[in-house]
A protein has these predicted regions:
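Conserved N-terminal segment of class I S-adenosyl-L-methionine
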Residues: 1-94, 98-102, 112-115, 142, ...
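Class I S-adenosylmethionine-dependent transferase superfamily signal
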Residues: 50, 118, 159
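A short His-aromatic
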Residues: 103-107
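A short glycine-rich, Lys/Arg-flanked "PGG" loop and its adjoining helix->strand segment in the class I
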Residues: 112-124
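Conserved beta-strand signature within the Rossmann-like core of class I S-adenosyl-L-methionine
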Residues: 125-132
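Short "lid" loop at the C-terminus of a central beta-strand within the Rossmann-like core
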Residues: 133-138, 172-176
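Acceptor-substrate binding/catalytic loop of class I
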Residues: 139-157
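Conserved S-adenosyl-L-methionine
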Residues: 163-175, 193-199
Length: 294
């Protein structure tokens, strides 16, 4: 599958890759030995990650092309793909232990229907792991595929309308140093460029995405995690490489023009006409010198 901006594909690199892989690696910690549903499974890479430890994973996507691609690439004894909508999931009641739904909610206007369907296919003590962009921060980027983005309060309220317990985490790609504690909310420290002062704020207030665990039974404990994504694959590095390549092209073009001028000049110096007119140029030089003395 090719990247269109609607569904992530594994050949993508940069921040988008770090975000998507981190979410699925995080979710894989809750699916060991479980029956799992991956809503909006897309290319299938995430469903495949979950299937490494789950008893069985069903990926559901509305796109026939995505389902066909994922089936051909990933299907096996513990993984299957079905075509269907998040608002009308093609599974029976209480069919799965865990539902994973990453970056799907904001693509639908029928968000209450989606949560109702997730609740229907989950077992009574089942777990939902779901993510969505943080509207106040993400909307600045613009996304033509998003129908209804949510702020923190709206996201939590929607989940609590269907589930008794909700636990919220934040996600944001950063390059820096991580100090991880054993409890409490993560504190984000940022030094202001204008005066060097240090700003202190809760990480979830600055997160670009929210990831929530929801269920009607006790929720499993969560730990902060850091996905060590190579800096050389970051968006910044890619932009610097692009700028460097452009500068190299300009340098090569300028060098080629200089060499062409030098070659033309050398050709002129070696030409018969240049050699034949050499006495005239010397005479003109002498006459010019005498004129200056007078």
């Amino acid at each position: 599958m090719e990247f269109t901006g609607e569904r992530f594909v594994p050949q993508c690199q940069g921040e988008i890759a770090a975000e998507h892989y981190h979410r699925y690696f995080f979710a894989s910690g809750f699916v060991a030995g479980k029956r799992v549903l991956d809503i909006a499974s897309g290319e299938g890479y995430g469903t495949h990650i979950l299937a490494q430890s789950a008893a069985h994973v069903t990926g559901v996507d509305i796109s026939p092309e995505a389902v066909a691609n994922a089936t051909q690439k990933y299907a096996g004894d513990r993984i299957a793909f079905l075509q269907g909508s998040a608002a009308t999931i093609p599974l029976p009641d209480a069919a799965v232990d865990v539902v994973v739904s990453f970056e799907t909610l904001e693509h639908l206007s029928e968000q209450e229907d989606m949560l109702g369907e997730i609740r229907r296919v989950l077992r009574q003590d089942g777990l939902l792991v779901i993510s969505t962009p943080n509207k106040p921060l993400y909307s600045r980027q613009g996304d033509n595929f998003h129908v209804k983005e949510l702020c923190r309060e709206e996201f939590v309220a929607l989940l609590k309308s269907r589930f008794a317990h909700v636990s919220l985490l934040g996600q944001k790609v950063m390059y820096g140093s991580l100090l991880s504690g054993t409890g409490g909310e993560t504190l984000l420290l940022r030094q202001r460029e204008e005066d060097g002062a240090v700003e202190r704020m809760l990480f979830t207030e600055q997160a670009r995405y929210f990831i929530a665990l929801a269920g009607n039974g006790p929720l499993p404990p969560t730990q902060s995690s850091f996905f060590d994504y190579p800096l050389e694959k970051s968006d910044l590095t890619a932009q610097l490489r692009e700028n460097l390549a452009e500068l190299q092209e300009r340098h090569d073009a300028a060098q080629a023009r200089l060499e062409a001028v030098e070659a033309a000049y050398t050709a002129i110096l070696a030409s018969r006409s240049w050699l034949a007119t050499a006495p005239l140029r010397r005479l003109r030089h002498l006459l010019k010198g005498k004129g200056n003395k007078s």
